A protein has these predicted regions:
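Active-site microenvironment for binding and transforming phosphate-containing groups
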Residues: 1-165
């Protein structure tokens, strides 16, 4: 990983650097405006943090991302095996119980929150389909990565063009 910001708010992955049309990063707890137990750069609105602080952190994150219009898509993860395809109609709906997101639409930032779980990022370099997966032990046992690849397969991804991180 390498620092993408001097204040350590964002760390990047070298593996996906070869694909300039996507951004692949992790945020840290540094530099946010949340207070108390959430004194961090918390962008997850499902954990009990103040909505105003979460929204300010999300705006800060948007300002750090390349591109003029970035829509953050942040699901309410429940350690499930549920995969959701994000399109223009669904992006504004609540994403309850979703632990993996898939889209081929530019301008969406698919987000997953992790602590001791593993973020898995998939990208088809030909079809430009991307997935972000929250793989905790329950999701892993339920084969969430395999199920996400199956959903991507419905969008005609090519396994030879699929990259994973």
């Amino acid at each position: 990983m390498k620092r993408l910001t001097s204040d350590n708010k964002m760390l990047g992955y070298e593996l996906m650097k070869a694909y300039p049309n996507i951004s692949c990063f992790s945020t840290t707890r540094h530099g946010g405006c949340s207070k108390g137990n959430y004194a961090s750069f918390n962008c997850n609105g499902y954990c009990g943090d103040e909505a105003e602080d979460v929204n300010r952190n999300r705006e800060l994150l948007r300002s750090l991302l390349p591109g003029e219009s970035v829509e953050l898509v942040i699901p309410h993860q429940t350690h499930s095996d549920h995969v959701k395809v994000v399109d223009t109609i669904q992006v504004n709906t609540e994403l309850e119980g979703v632990d993996a997101l898939v889209t081929d639409i530019p301008g969406y930032c698919l987000c997953v929150s992790t602590a001791d779980c593993v973020p898995v990022l998939l990208y088809d370099t030909r079809k430009k389909v991307v997935a972000a997966i929250h793989a905790g032990w329950r999701g892993t046992v339920a084969r969430i990565v395999e199920k996400t690849v199956s959903v991507m397969d419905n969008q005609s991804v090519s396994y030879t063009h699929l990259r994973a991180h």
